[in-house]
Amino acid sequence: MVSKKTIEARKAYYNEDVVLSKEAHDFYHNLDKHGENHNLDKDNLKTIIFGSLDGIITIFAIVSGCVGAKITPTQVIIIGIGNLFANAISMGFSEYTSSTAQRDFMLAEKKREEWEIENCPSEEKQEMIDIYMNKYKFDSEDARNLVEITFRNKNFFLEHMMSEELGLIVTNEDKNECLKKGIIMFLSFAVFGIIPLSAYVAYTVFFGYTDYTTSFLVVFISTLTTLFILGLFKSQFTNQKPITCALYMVLNGMIAGMVPFLLGVVLKNNISE
């Protein structure tokens, strides 16, 4: 999970509490020294949030459109399950391939920069001097001093240069990590995507099917409730306030659900069979 230091620091920021902010930094500074500050992998967190939100909204939209078009419950369930797994597999594979491509590009650029630092150190230093002067407005002497200090640690200089010059963050990702991201995306999409479908199945199968409007409302309420909770969870890792983040997710879900439902109703009433 996100570090306690970060949670306390954000709480202090939201409340404009300087004392709490200092306490959070001072207390957890000692924990950091002993390696006790555990941070959640930001890339995996991004994958989980994106996959879960995309899953629940995508399947919600599909079910809503089917219900609006007054498709039979059996057909809705078949269409929903088919789309759930098809989209989950597609999203997982896309995450794997994009992560692999990003990793390969990053490693290729890293090797190139390593070669240039080894064979053209003066030119590489001058590039960083120019960046410090042009981007950060350091004077010539300070820029050169910074470069000479950072160049003593070749790994730091390499990673810092890749970040400043190429906009790339050096990671230690291997192909197993890329595969892991793909699996996380698949599971996130599938687990949360099944929520609106499960609500529909529960209403139509276990409680008896009555009418299309009520079934839509059941799916609508269950989906928006889940999105609200996801929004609160997401706010723990962003700079948004919990309620603001949650309401934004609910608004997104409302639009994504209402549009296909209304389109289904209109098309059903205007297209002859």
From Swiss-Prot:
Result when mutating residue 124 to A/Q: No effect on iron tolerance in a yeast heterologous expression system
Catalytically driven reaction(s): Fe(2+)(in) = Fe(2+)(out)
Entry superkingdom: Eukaryota
UniProt entry keywords in alphabetical sequence: Cytoplasmic vesicle, Endoplasmic reticulum, Ion transport, Iron, Iron transport, Membrane, Metal-binding, Phosphoprotein, Transmembrane, Transmembrane helix, Transport, Vacuole
Localization annotation: Vacuole membrane; Endoplasmic reticulum membrane; Cytoplasmic vesicle membrane
GO term, biological process aspect, one: intracellular manganese ion homeostasis
Cytoplasmic side: 1-47, 97-181, 234-246
Residues binding Fe cation 2: 113, 124, 127, 161
A Gene Ontology molecular function term of the record: iron ion transmembrane transporter activity
Bilayer-crossing regions: 48-68, 76-96, 182-202, 213-233, 247-267
Description of what induces expression: Expression is modulated by the levels of iron ions in the environment.
Vacuolar topological domain residue ranges: 69-75, 203-212, 268-273
Binding annotation for Fe cation 1: 113, 116, 124, 127, 165
Phenotype upon changing residue 127 to Q: Reduces iron tolerance in a yeast heterologous expression system
Effect of residue 162 to A: No effect on iron tolerance in a yeast heterologous expression system
CDD domains listed in its UniProt record: Nodulin-21_like_3
Gene Ontology cellular component list: endoplasmic reticulum membrane; membrane; vacuolar membrane
Keyword Magnesium: no
Residues that bind Fe cation 3: 116, 124, 127
Membrane topology annotation: Multi-pass membrane protein
Result of changing residue 113 to A: No effect on iron tolerance in a yeast heterologous expression system
Family per record: Belongs to the CCC1 family.
Assembly information from the UniProt record: Monomer.
Note: Iron transport is insensitive to the proton pump inhibitor bafilomycin A1 or to the proton ionophore CCCP in a yeast heterologous expression system. Functions as a proton-driven antiport in a bacterial heterologous expression system.
Physiological role: Vacuolar iron transporter involved in the transfer of iron ions from the cytosol to the vacuole for intracellular iron storage. Involved in detoxification of excess iron. The transport mechanism is not well defined and the role of protons is not clear.
Name of the protein described by the UniProt record: Vacuolar iron transporter
Organism placement in taxonomy: Eukaryota, Sar, Alveolata, Apicomplexa, Aconoidasida
